Amino acid sequence: GWDVLPSGSLLAFMTIFRVIAALLMPALAQRGIDRRPLLSISLLAQTVGYIGLLTAPLQFPHLWVALIGFGLGACFALSLLLTLDHRRDPREAGQLAAFVQGVGFLINAISPWLTGWLRELTGSFVSAWMVLTVTVVAMLILTRVFSPATYRTGSMNMQFESR
């Protein structure tokens, strides 16, 4: 329910933080093989941002959208890295990345429709923010799956090929 200028300002603010995180995370991710801590930080940032929108949307709106934007940008960059971590063969890595991005974009294609439908149904964005919060928390739980022990390194592939 905001006017065009303030809402556009929030969108721009979110976009700035998305770009910063998307550029920063790959550099930070090079420091170690386990990407789960960075992924957890990015998902926690989103969770705090969505909870802020749910509980105090007018008190600190720039903080909430900055956290959400940072988390979204970081997650996108890290999702590209995680798919490459699991496959060292360029063809397999490309196939996995295409699958992950394809499914991700299909899921994201539903988000605007679902948000609009929930807003039309309830008269506010609160239910959409709840859905997003639950989704991000579920993703946070799933980060445990991305253990470096499951990564396929070049040396492991060579060991299997030599047998």
Task: Map each language-model feature to its residues.
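Transmembrane alpha-helical segments of major facilitator superfamily
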Residues: 9-18, 100, 104, 135
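Paired small-residue
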Residues: 60-68
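Juxtamembrane helix-start elements in MFS-like secondary transporters
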Residues: 2-11, 93, 97
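Structural signature of the two symmetry-related core transmembrane helices
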Residues: 37-52
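Helix-to-loop junctions at the C-terminal end of transmembrane segments
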Residues: 21-34
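Intracellular juxtamembrane helix-capping segments at the cytosolic ends
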Residues: 74-88
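A late C-terminal transmembrane helix in Major Facilitator Superfamily
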Residues: 86-132
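Intrinsic disorder in cytosolic terminal tails and internal cytosolic loops
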Residues: 146-163
